[in-house]
Amino acid sequence: MKKPEKITSRTADFAKWYVDVITQADLMNYGPIKGTIYFKPLGYKIWENIVKIVNAYFVKQKIENVYFPLLIPQDFIEKEKKHIEGFAPELLTITKVGDKNLVENIYIRPTSELLFADYFKAEIAKNNILPIKLNQWSQVLRWEKTTNPFLRNTEFLWQEGHTIHASKVEANQFAKKIARFYKYFLENYLAIPVISGQKTEREKFAGAVNTYTVEAMMQNFRALQSATAHFLGQNFAKNFEIFYKNKENKSQIPFQTSWGLSTRLIGAIVMVHSDDNGLIFPPKIAPIQVDILEFFSKKNQEVKIFAKRIAKILKNAKIAYKIDDTDQQIGYKINNSEVHGAPIRIEIGPNEVKNNQICLVRRDNHQKFFFNIDLLKEKCRKILEQIQADLFKKAKIRLLENTVFVNSINEFEQAIKNNKFVIAPFSESPEREQEIQEKTGATARCILPKNSFFALPQAGNSIFSGEKTNKFVLFAKSY
């Protein structure tokens, strides 16, 4: 098989490999402004599949979709200076319209907590019904210093959910529930194993009491924060003077959550699963699950007829497919299919037609299968399930083999130098985290829960102070 010439190998230059894959596989083109991209049809279809799956869960949870303004007024910003401080370097500000200066600045949303707080205040004053559970699919803008397509864009697509509750416990538990769903979604649909936990004080979302995160390992052993859920407490409710009447008709301040995932998951799919030939899609999220390649169909119409037969079977089985009926050479068609990442390709030529036979090739390991067309539906479903399971297993092994426990700062520094995920007993200050980042480039990804799939000891000695602690923190270099 001829290797695509335009894709750099992962070992030679991982960053270049990533860009080569997403461009050659037609996921995106660079936009005219730094940090923006044109989503091409294949790239946007991945997002549509994500939206479809996640929305189905939201419906079950009675979370309703809304759409809120892109623009935030200055007085909202003044109310939440602490929250906005975290976004200040990235905040896009409108100061002028035409040739006229605005009396007050207008801000383009980096996130929508302020708008949802304002909305909740009006709705509760009107109806006094809690909880309210909402979500919006939208775009936000953040003027990032360093950009990377899908992983860190100036403008990106996401879902941001917001809820408001009468009870502190109910709100916090709901944030945790959403974080568990994100873990389930990444592992069961994207075949990406994750480490879940709570962010440290330094790393948590600005304005949150607690932030719950799911962290994934890329093939270059960097961490990617893949989704987060925040328990906001009463922080926004107090500043926006949100009140509800309890059963005793007394005014109480409610509790909020916010949570989201974004198009950076497209980058995660690429970085976790793909190879030097191009994309590899997990079947459950793949825009095209089966690529049907016609060979010599211009000279042999029976090949076209056979391809349509296959397509009909796949359509009835609700398996997404595409037919390549171009007159390109065989090698080109195979390479093109490899680059674009369909989990399965079916190669059809005169011999397959003559023998009423299917030639099926797995994208992930290039294993070939030959069988009668009557077995297509059964075989396809079984092989797609196996690919999904194998991709997850491969990524899980990578995660486990490259995550280490350390008990001293020397062990810590060596492990980070070796590009490992590092779990360490740690009960230090945010300033100490800053020191670690400056010295090693690693950040605290999350505090591991006691029920983590890692066998955590009951306690350990914090790697800096030596004090006894039952807190174990995951550190890694990250995107």
From Swiss-Prot:
Subcellular location: Cytoplasm
Domain of life: Bacteria
Main subcellular location of this protein, as a coarse class: cytoplasm
One Gene Ontology MF term: proline-tRNA ligase activity
S-S bridge residues: none
The keyword Nucleotide-binding appears for this protein: yes
Keywords: Aminoacyl-tRNA synthetase, ATP-binding, Cytoplasm, Ligase, Nucleotide-binding, Protein biosynthesis
Catalytic reaction annotation: tRNA(Pro) + L-proline + ATP = L-prolyl-tRNA(Pro) + AMP + diphosphate
Gene3D superfamilies: Anticodon-binding domain, Bira Bifunctional Protein, Domain 2, C-terminal domain of ProRS
Alphabetical list of Pfam families matching this protein: HGTP_anticodon, ProRS-C_1, tRNA-synt_2b
Ribonucleoprotein found in the keyword field: no
Single Gene Ontology BP annotation: prolyl-tRNA aminoacylation
Gene Ontology cellular component annotations, sorted alphabetically: aminoacyl-tRNA synthetase multienzyme complex; cytoplasm
Broad enzyme group: ligase
E.C. no: 6.1.1.15
Subunit structure, as described in the record: Homodimer.
The protein's role, per its UniProt record: Catalyzes the attachment of proline to tRNA(Pro) in a two-step reaction: proline is first activated by ATP to form Pro-AMP and then transferred to the acceptor end of tRNA(Pro).
Family affiliation: Belongs to the class-II aminoacyl-tRNA synthetase family. ProS type 3 subfamily.
Free-text note on domains in this protein's UniProt record: Consists of three domains: the N-terminal catalytic domain, the anticodon-binding domain and the C-terminal extension.
Protein name: Proline--tRNA ligase
Gene: proS
